[in-house]
UniProtKB/Swiss-Prot annotation:
Membrane topology: Multi-pass membrane protein
GO function terms (MF aspect): electron transporter, transferring electrons within cytochrome b6/f complex of photosystem II activity; metal ion binding; oxidoreductase activity
Oligomeric form and interacting partners: The 4 large subunits of the cytochrome b6-f complex are cytochrome b6, subunit IV (17 kDa polypeptide, PetD), cytochrome f and the Rieske protein, while the 4 small subunits are PetG, PetL, PetM and PetN. The complex functions as a dimer.
Chain ranges passing through the membrane: 32-52, 90-110, 116-136, 186-206
Domain of life according to the entry: Eukaryota
Protein name as it appears in the record: Cytochrome b6
Cell compartments where the protein resides: Plastid, Chloroplast thylakoid membrane
Role summary: Component of the cytochrome b6-f complex, which mediates electron transfer between photosystem II (PSII) and photosystem I (PSI), cyclic electron flow around PSI, and state transitions.
Family affiliation: Belongs to the cytochrome b family. PetB subfamily.
Amino acid sequence: MSKVYDWFEERLEIQAIADDITSKYVPPHVNIFYCLGGITLTCFLVQVATGFAMTFYYRPTVTEAFASVQYIMTEANFGWLIRSVHRWSASMMVLMMILHVFRVYLTGGFKKPRELTWVTGVILAVLTASFGVTGYSLPRDQIGYWAVKIVTGVPEAIPVIGSPLVELLRGSASVGQSTLTRFYSLHTFVLPLLTAVFMLMHFPMIRKQGISGPL
């Protein structure tokens, strides 16, 4: 086993990486509220795992979506648990994200030289909210249908471009199969990919600049 480790150590310098991670200085003023970003990340990872598991059973069509969710909850092995964890962690992720943004703002973590960290964080917050909107529509139940109809209808009040924006969001003039397909694609592919990209920008900047000091 040691020979295998030595082989990787010689090429990747694993010990140096481990030492850098474990020896990072943590300011004395840091408390549990500075863990909110990490908790949000943990919730996101839970979302990815449970969401991936549900894609094996979920069918993104207006005629089968609701029935497939019922199947997950009543027939699939541990499906009820996986979907419940997905819902609970989704709510927790939104809550932790909001608290994290407030903590950073109230402690001045957005100030120089951390402006870019703040910008990427705000983008991640918007992406988190987008997860909620797109995911809410996927069960194709009454609550999800009317929520999507209202949310996608908001831009209609904008002069000139309002109606085209609504059609762009829905895929048609009304909420239907095109809307479900778009929201499913956004929820399972586009948003996770964008979130991963901005996380890969966000965390190295935190690592490089360190945690902001007390006010």
